[in-house]
């Protein structure tokens, strides 16, 4: 399940790294966090062998959770957007199939290429670009993160990208990649601002993002669905950037960045007087609180991967979205 490229990442800002003090020299920073000397040194986030093992362990845990419809079985191997999407999916599955997943097919991730950035401090992260036995010919891009040496690598992002669309990354002579800071100004949109700009674009349009399936086409589809006989659908989009949802970016060979980021979306369906909201499927019902009478509000978490050039429009290459909750009224 391996082959390599190089990696980078930021995340879980609220935690100070807790490292065993056995013969290790420690010092206190102004913030009160304990810092291990050498932590500020620029180092590869992981070895290629560690990255391959992290991918293997994630796949094993994911398959166990999917087979049993039990979110606790892969909770230690997911975080951020992927954890929000995956745990909700498993919760709905368990509600409808308490004996487990009758359609379980083990996920197989092969032809893995690892892009591992060199960076200082925590969190550290890397990208696995893989082929899967699901999702057609799309490449599965997973971003793994961790906040300390004793912590488990967790998958924070999972996006699917069409073959040939994954860019070449800038690497040093040893094959290690370069992490792009969240506040970088040498790209069209600083990675920290992509989630806000994307959600603003979905509401108002604009020229920041290139036309495509996840931009102009999605806006057109939502506009088409907003008003139908007896039913009005409203859309609200919000950025999601803090903690485990922080964006992560890799420098591309042409000077731009490949950015992974998260957003939150709400869809409210309201039925006209004397009519009712169409009955949703069982998975939606399993995640919905309250009785659906005149309206249904659904909350989704979406993780995106975008090509953020040094100059020009941002291209959203892939997006995976999942329902996380619902409310009937």
From Swiss-Prot:
Residues 1-32 form the signal peptide. GO terms for cellular component: plasma membrane. It comes from the Bacteria. It is a lipid-anchor. The keyword Ribosomal protein does not apply. A lipid is attached at residue 33 (S-diacylglycerol cysteine). Its main location: membrane. This is Uncharacterized lipoprotein SCO2278.
């Amino acid at each position: 399940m391996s082959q390599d490229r190089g990696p980078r990442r930021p995340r879980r800002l609220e935690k100070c790294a807790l490292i065993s003090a056995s013969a290790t020299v420690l010092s206190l920073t102004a913030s009160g966090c304990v810092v291990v000397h050498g932590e500020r040194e620029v180092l590869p986030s992981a070895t290629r062998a560690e990255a391959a093992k992290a991918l293997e362990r994630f796949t094993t845990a994911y398959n166990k959770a999917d087979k049993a419809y039990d979110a606790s079985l892969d909770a230690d191997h997911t975080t951020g957007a992927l954890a929000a999407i995956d745990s909700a999916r498993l919760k709905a599955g368990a509600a409808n199939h308490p004996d487990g997943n009758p359609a379980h097919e083990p996920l197989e991730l092969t032809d893995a290429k690892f892009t591992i950035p060199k960076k200082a401090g925590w969190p550290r992260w890397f990208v696995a670009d893989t082929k899967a036995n699901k999702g057609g010919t799309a490449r599965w891009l997973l971003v793994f993160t961790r906040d300390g040496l004793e912590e488990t690598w967790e998958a924070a992002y999972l996006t699917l990208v069409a073959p040939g669309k994954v860019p070449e990354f800038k690497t040093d002579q040893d094959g290690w990649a370069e992490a792009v800071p969240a506040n970088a100004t040498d790209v069209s949109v600083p990675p920290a601002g992509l989630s806000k700009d994307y959600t603003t674009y979905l509401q108002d349009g604009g020229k920041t993002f290139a036309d495509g399936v996840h931009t102009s086409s999605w806006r057109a589809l939502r506009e088409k669905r907003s008003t139908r006989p007896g039913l009005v659908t409203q859309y609200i989009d919000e950025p999601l950037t803090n903690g485990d949802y922080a964006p992560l970016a890799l420098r591309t060979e042409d000077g731009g960045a490949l950015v992974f980021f998260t957003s939150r979306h709400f869809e409210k369906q309201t039925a006209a007087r004397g009519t009712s909201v169409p009955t949703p499927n069982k998975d939606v019902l399993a995640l919905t609180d309250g009785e659906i009478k005149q309206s249904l509000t659904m909350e989704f978490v979406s993780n995106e991967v975008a090509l953020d050039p040094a100059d020009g429009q941002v291209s959203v290459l892939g997006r995976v979205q999942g329902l996380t909750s619902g409310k009937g009224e």
